[in-house]
């Protein structure tokens, strides 16, 4: 599988994903991980918090690791620094995830190679919430409900 970096690929990944394990999810509403996970939960995804520091986040049980999650997950969304991603990639492979997603500003080629070699799809340096809103029309949550993003002025 190649690295997913085009609109068609991102649309497919988001449309096929039902469950998202969010590694590094914070219980604090003002943290980017919480904001993105809440958005995805509000848009019908099953969000599975992964953070050893909490027992519950967003009304869901919080697990200390991917391995501790009962049952399968479709996507592993990483809110950790780039150096922390390779072990998470190995856990995602062991868990049987389909997608390893590294958030905006995060790229790790070693982690990508681990996931790609095991057949996972990989997204790097993109925010799942931003991509969902941009591609699948969840723009109304941000206060815009056109369904279309344009760089051109109307008129």
Model-identified regions with their sequence ranges:
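Glycine-rich, highly charged phosphate/nucleotide-binding loops
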Residues: 1-6, 56-86
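Conserved beta-strand elements of the Class I
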Residues: 21-23
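NAD(P)-binding Rossmann-fold cofactor-contacting core
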Residues: 26-30, 38-57
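A short helix->loop->beta-strand "cap" motif at the edges of active sites that frequently abuts
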Residues: 43-45, 95-98, 118-120
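Short, charged, surface-exposed secondary-structure boundary motifs
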Residues: 57-60, 74, 110-113, 131-137
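Mid-chain, well-packed structural core segment of small domains
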Residues: 71-109
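Rossmann-fold NAD(P)-binding glycine/threonine-rich loop
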Residues: 104-130
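A charged, well-structured terminal subsegment
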Residues: 131-155
